């Protein structure tokens, strides 16, 4: 499948839609496979728009976008993504999906929703932040909101999110919460209580509004967004010009369109390759960093074991010395007793 088949026409249509009827808020769900991104998207939309199942193997295979119109007429555009930042995911797949995600976000991202599950927080999830910053720069942190799924499990345990995080909050998660000003919300995607459903969505949208206000109403956008938008507009304009050509046969018109599509596809390939290069460099750096951290951890464990062994040896030696001293004391007392009797 070519890049054009993957997203060419889709991008053109999206950018054209964005110019005439821009969704007020665009939210992008990212996170590890199986964390509940699709279920969270469905909760936000108020309907089952994305495929979702309770399993650690994700069912989302490509970026998707769905919209909901609120009572006040505002439009919420929700973009669901597969596990883009798992270290095991191929860079070429991620590159294509990043380009697709950007196109679905249309003219910018109002909030990045980092989805974590309270059921399984793993150290490898620290890569999400590194990948996001490598692709979009440190400014992306200003648009991040942390969403925890598994609210049903905490309710069963009669535990609040604050209590859960007080007991278990890895360093990487503390860092993420710190750089996004502790913007976090808990979702129970299994509840059938309409009031609870509405409350958690409203809390999230309130956080989105705070992000929008903090960023002066401007959605996140960078060179990738601008370049993709320019290429899509160029493609649309060129096709319109071809439609207006006179004195050419239908076959010739079709050939012109084909050449335009091929040119657009080449530009998409170039942009995607640029994204893939960034991803590979980041993955290589992260793997090296994780390797160094693991080596340092093993070295620390080795030293701790050595200290413990040394301490055990010293304690054993002290005990032996004490026992010998006690024995010598008893022998001395025995000798003294004999001397007194004499």
From Swiss-Prot:
Name of a matching Pfam family: AIG1
Gene Ontology molecular function: GTP binding
Tissue: Mainly expressed in leaves.
Listed PROSITE patterns: G_AIG1
GO biological process: negative regulation of defense response to bacterium
Transmembrane segments: none
Binding-site positions, GTP: 31-39, 52, 189
Location of the region described as G5 in the Swiss-Prot/TrEMBL record: 188-190
UniProt entry tagged with the keyword Glycoprotein: no
UniProt feature coiled coil, ranges: 276-342
Induction: Up-regulated by brassinolides. Down-regulated by 2-aminoethoxyvinylglycine (AVG), high CO(2), isoxaben, and propiconazole treatments.
Domain AIG1-type G: from-to ranges: 22-229
Annotated stretches, region: G4: 149-152
Renumbered residue ranges of the record's region G1: 31-38
Segments for region (G2): 58-62
Record keyword GTP-binding present: yes
Alphabetical keyword list: Coiled coil, GTP-binding, Nucleotide-binding
PANTHER family: GTP-BINDING PROTEIN A, GTPASE, IMAP FAMILY MEMBER-RELATED
The family this protein is said to belong to: Belongs to the TRAFAC class TrmE-Era-EngA-EngB-Septin-like GTPase superfamily. AIG1/Toc34/Toc159-like paraseptin GTPase family. IAN subfamily.
Protein name (Swiss-Prot/TrEMBL): Immune-associated nucleotide-binding protein 9
